[in-house]
Amino acid sequence: MTLVPMVVEPTSRGERAYDIYTRLLKERIIFITGPIEDQMASLVVAQLIFLEAENPEKDISMYINSPGGVVTAGLSIYDTMQYVKPRIATLCLGQAASMGSLLLAAGEKGMRCALPNSRIMIHQPSGGFQGQATDIEIHAKEILNIKSRLNYIYVKHTGRELSEVVASMERDNFMSADSAQDFGIIDKVIEKRLDIEV
């Protein structure tokens, strides 16, 4: 069981308690923490759509500390990030691996940051399948299609050539924050809040 801190705020009717993530959502801050899976992705998508409905002109901040996870769940978040009108600033604290790194790169150009000791990792998608030979062949074709799609998404957001992205994602490719900036996944490494213009 995870302990989530509560924040108590005074109101005209007394005090009101929020869990810390709900309170931060009021400030237009969304957290992506832990493995990316369907339920978590649905919550993030709902938060993005809610914040857009509340104010389509005001920026959203997304803080990422994730080892990655299910590709389709991550792509639902990615597509929603591209779909909504507000600009989305992304910030890696801790790690942004696999789908986490794709979401980090998907932030608004110029607003993608990482803290100095963050670790970013890109790689090709992986999967394991069992069953009849024909079913395995179907799944193998699908994972190759997903690999190709992810490569093009990284090309779009990093500005790298497709051949560079393919070579860089052949195996687990761990990067420091500075290396991720050089690669084009982020725009800036920040040490203090004053270093960021969001």
Swiss-Prot record:
Entry EC number(s): 3.4.21.92
UniProt KW Cytoplasm keyword: yes
Active site positions: 98, 123
Keywords linked to the UniProt accession: Cytoplasm, Hydrolase, Protease, Serine protease
Gene3D superfamilies assigned to the protein according to its UniProt record, in alphabetical order: 2-enoyl-CoA Hydratase, Chain A, domain 1 (3.90.226.10)
A molecular function GO annotation: serine-type endopeptidase activity
Signal peptide span: none
Catalytic activity: Hydrolysis of proteins to small peptides in the presence of ATP and magnesium. alpha-casein is the usual test substrate. In the absence of ATP, only oligopeptides shorter than five residues are hydrolyzed (such as succinyl-Leu-Tyr-|-NHMec, and Leu-Tyr-Leu-|-Tyr-Trp, in which cleavage of the -Tyr-|-Leu- and -Tyr-|-Trp bonds also occurs)
One GO CC annotation: cytoplasm
Highest rank taxon of the organism: Bacteria
BP GO terms, sorted: protein quality control for misfolded or incompletely synthesized proteins
InterPro entries listed in its UniProt record: ClpP, ClpP/crotonase-like_dom_sf, ClpP/TepA, ClpP_His_AS, ClpP_Ser_AS
Cellular localization per UniProt: Cytoplasm
Subunit structure: Fourteen ClpP subunits assemble into 2 heptameric rings which stack back to back to give a disk-like structure with a central cavity, resembling the structure of eukaryotic proteasomes.
Primary role: Cleaves peptides in various proteins in a process that requires ATP hydrolysis. Has a chymotrypsin-like activity. Plays a major role in the degradation of misfolded proteins.
Name this protein carries in UniProt: ATP-dependent Clp protease proteolytic subunit
Source organism (scientific name): Ehrlichia ruminantium (strain Gardel)
Lineage summary: Bacteria, Pseudomonadati, Pseudomonadota, Alphaproteobacteria, Rickettsiales
Gene designation: clpP
